[in-house]
Amino acid sequence: MSKMAQKWDAYYRLMRLDRPIGTMLLLWPCLMALLLAADGMPDLRVLIIFIIGVVVMRACGCIINDYADRKLDSHVARTRSRPLASGEVTVAEALTLFVVLGLFAFSLVLLLNPLVVQLSVVGIILTIIYPFTKRWTNMPQMFLGVVWSWSIPMAYAAQTGEVPASAWWLFAANWCWTVAYDTMYAMVDRDDDLKVGIKSTAILFGRFDREIIGAFQLAALGCFIAAGWSGDRGLLYGLGVLTFVGFSAYQQRLIYGRERGDCFKAFLNNNWAGLSLFLALGADYAFAAL
């Protein structure tokens, strides 16, 4: 592989394009918000902008996260091969890529209404702050929940020009769900994080981690039900919620022994939980339109 090809491969990995799980976990609630806000028929232009925006902003988040953690990642088994930690990408190159992607994402929201633009400014600030919360709080996953739910009010604003009270049920559901699955993710790195001083809810919850994750899963379930109720959704969405319960139970089984590999499997399984909810919501709208 040529030096140029190696550099582009490093950029590709820096943006986590080789690991789309994070993009998918961001995408499902965003698409659900667009469906609920538009009563099942989102504007195609808005839909395309948000799909591209999710991919780009997830890449931005990964870059700024690796920048913040670059001196710590080399001490953690799972992260020591990341491009910044390994030296494949320089700090200047990473920050330049972050700015370019951020400006591109901002240019997308400029195609939408002023409220979306205002919300996007808050979103980019939250994205920049998040990686540093792991230094000063034991609850960075709770901050991440806000960051990863921010596309929801933006989606409502893009479709309706406002953020109605009903939008916050989906926001709350996704916040609780994010805290649950990112705590599973943090359980994978818990031993290494303790050594290097990174804080997480997996460390904070300690031996009660499984029970507290379960409580967040239950809270997410209740809020997903409320979000569907506020949108007058029917049986098919309800079946999707039941599927979410099944996935959550399976994840609890996986994390029972707190083995790294199983905790990571539980985290990955949340992609299917999100997909099932989105498909159920879409099917519910499609059936109602018959």
From Swiss-Prot:
Keyword Cell inner membrane attached: yes
PANTHER family named in the record: 4-HYDROXYBENZOATE POLYPRENYLTRANSFERASE, MITOCHONDRIAL, PRENYLTRANSFERASES
Places the protein is found: Cell inner membrane
UniProt xrefs under Pfam families: UbiA
CDD domains membership: PT_UbiA_COQ2
PROSITE patterns for the chain: UBIA (PS00943)
Function as written in the Swiss-Prot or TrEMBL entry: Catalyzes the prenylation of para-hydroxybenzoate (PHB) with an all-trans polyprenyl group. Mediates the second step in the final reaction sequence of ubiquinone-8 (UQ-8) biosynthesis, which is the condensation of the polyisoprenoid side chain with PHB, generating the first membrane-bound Q intermediate 3-octaprenyl-4-hydroxybenzoate.
EC primary class: transferase
UniProt name for this protein: 4-hydroxybenzoate octaprenyltransferase
Reaction(s) catalysed by this chain's protein: all-trans-octaprenyl diphosphate + 4-hydroxybenzoate = 4-hydroxy-3-(all-trans-octaprenyl)benzoate + diphosphate
GO BP, sorted A to Z: ubiquinone biosynthetic process
Keywords recorded for this protein, A-Z: Cell inner membrane, Cell membrane, Magnesium, Membrane, Transferase, Transmembrane, Transmembrane helix, Ubiquinone biosynthesis
Annotated Gene Ontology cellular component terms: plasma membrane
Pathway assignment: Cofactor biosynthesis; ubiquinone biosynthesis
An annotated Gene Ontology molecular function: 4-hydroxybenzoate polyprenyltransferase activity
Cofactor: Mg(2+)
